[in-house]
Amino acid sequence: MRALVALLAVFCGCSPPPSYDKDDCPLYSELGPVRANPAGAMGRNLEAQFTFKVCPPETGVAEIRRKRIELKQALLKLMSAKTTDALEDPLRIEKLQREVHLLVNKEILKKTKVQEVYVTGFEVK
């Protein structure tokens, strides 16, 4: 009896592997530039562009397209909170990439996930 319970736990408790290869996940780059005024940086503007690798392939891009406005608002909020010191950090783009990746997967997307975030443009004016 214990063996049967153990087998059921093993087979029912594990989720199947994804039915897609993560390398085949499409890129979403239709968001356009996001412009913000950083915190305490009067007269300076930050403009960034992002591309997202979204999985699973069929539903990933559809969900991120549906949530485009929410995504842009969340990015604007994140970028507006950046300080002058943060904008001068040599690792600013890498940090922004990680922050955006977490933000999108935790707050925006519910049924799909961003696998990679690419910063395809970054300019402080």
Regions found by a protein language model. Name each.
Residues M1-K125:
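Flexible, low-complexity charged segments
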